[in-house]
Design a protein with these regions (language model features):
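Small/aliphatic-rich secondary-structure junction motif
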Residues: 2-73, 182-238, 267, 344-345
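Conserved N-terminal glycine/acidic-rich loop preference
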Residues: 202, 213, 221, 231, ...
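Short, flexible helix-coil linker/hinge segments at the edges of structured domains or between repeats
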Residues: 164-188
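General small-molecule cofactor/ligand-binding pocket signal
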Residues: 53-55, 103-107, 156, 220-222, ...
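A short acidic, glycine-rich active-site loop
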Residues: 72-86, 239-250
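Glycine-rich, Arg-bearing micro-motifs that act as flexible, cationic patches
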Residues: 127-150, 164-168, 290-316, 330
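Structural beta-alpha unit
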Residues: 2-20, 33, 93-125, 164-167, ...
Length: 345
């Protein structure tokens, strides 16, 4: 049984010091979405043998006062804070059976800002796709759209539709209907990562390989080729589509050899898929333990994820999505030794 401790609300300016969360941070708001994120985060903390920090954030709303004074009225801070503390206590109770160290905090401030600041020291941020509404409920929803693009650490968005695979239930009739429509999907022990030839995608592949090793899973590297491939800058037009697929597969095979040099015991598969990046990713999420992408790229998976199609990936995925921020990795230096690089001129 891990140690459990309720922390006082620290001053925001002290968040960057040594007391800031160092392990996995999960945002909760009392909603079913937040509960799913919490369960996923607790399991991940157990896999990594890292502490879990549970956080909820609230802000005190200000309303225009009625009457002739033209003033403003505020809601009692203590009332809202008590509700937030109850949410935290419920979350602490829910993960009490995991063999992890857990602490928690209630933060007074904008949820996006709180979590973004925590990303400076956290290993991983985890949250649901939307919240329950209300003041504390603002933690999720818009946060799940904003954070992946700006967080300093990797983020995982956990959609409510995968509650059944986490052993959770929901009263959301829309989600239950969607789960019934999808049917029981057997989850494969596989981590899927989308690549598009960018260096950022290769960084995402390395993070995906780390995740696959932790899960004891196969890593599946996928490149999507849309029908109108002229939208992909490095694809010539007109083209021999069959030849294009063969060239991309050869490049993926070279990338596989590179990965195996760094992860000799990892099972790695590679595949070229016909279709749009969003469609391919959503389809893969139905069966994968996790799908992984970078924050930006050439216009395929990563380039589209946090641009105009973010709703099509993060909001329609059927499983958890890990987004990897841009960063340097010394293992990228030897990639060229293993053959042609996807997307290279």
């Amino acid at each position: 049984m891990g140690a459990h401790e309720m922390q006082p609300d620290p001053e925001r300016e002290n968040m960057a010091n040594s007391t800031a969360p160092q392990g996995i941070v999960v945002g909760v708001d009392g909603s079913d979405h937040g509960q799913c994120a919490l369960v996923w985060a607790a399991r991940e903390a157990e896999r990594r043998r890292r502490p879990l920090h549970i956080v909820t954030a609230y802000s005190v709303p200000i309303f225009a006062a009625s009457g002739l004074d033209g003033g403003y009225a505020t809601v009692d801070d203590s009332v809202i804070r008590e509700g937030a503390e109850a949410i935290i206590q419920q979350a602490m109770d829910k993960v009490s059976g995991y063999n992890i160290d857990v602490d928690a905090s209630v933060e007074n401030g904008d949820a996006s800002g709180v979590l973004l600041e925590m990303s400076e020291t956290a290993e991983l941020l985890v949250f649901g796709t939307r919240g329950r509404g209300g003041f504390v409920g603002r933690l999720l929803g818009s946060v799940s759209s904003a954070l992946p693009a700006h967080a300093k650490c990797p983020t995982v968005t956990v959609p409510l539709i995968c509650s059944d695979r986490l052993g959770e239930t929901t009263d959301d009739k829309r989600i239950r209907a969607e789960q019934a429509k999808e049917g029981h999907k057997q989850v494969e022990n596989v981590v899927v990562v989308g690549v598009d030839g960018s260096e950022q995608a290769r960084v995402a592949v390395l993070e995906a390989a780390d995740q696959a090793e932790r899960l004891g899973a196969t890593l599946r590297v996928i490149c999507a080729v849309p029908q109108f491939s002229g939208s992909v800058a490095w694809v010539p037009a007109p083209m021999d589509r069959q030849g294009l697929f063969e060239d991309i597969q050869n490049q993926l095979d070279a990338g596989k050899a590179w990965l195996k040099s760094h992860y000799p015991n990892l099972r790695v598969e590679s595949e070229v898929k016909d279709g749009s990046a969003v469609d391919v990713m959503v389809d893969a999420s139905r069966h994968a333990e996790l799908v992984v992408v970078g924050t930006r790229g050439r216009g395929g998976f990563t380039g589209m994820l946090l641009g105009s199609t973010s709703g099509g990936v993060l909001h329609h995925t059927k499983g958890p999505v890990l987004v990897v921020p841009d960063r340097d990795d010394p293992r990228l230096a030897d990639r060229a030794k293993f053959g042609p690089i996807l997307g290279a001129a």
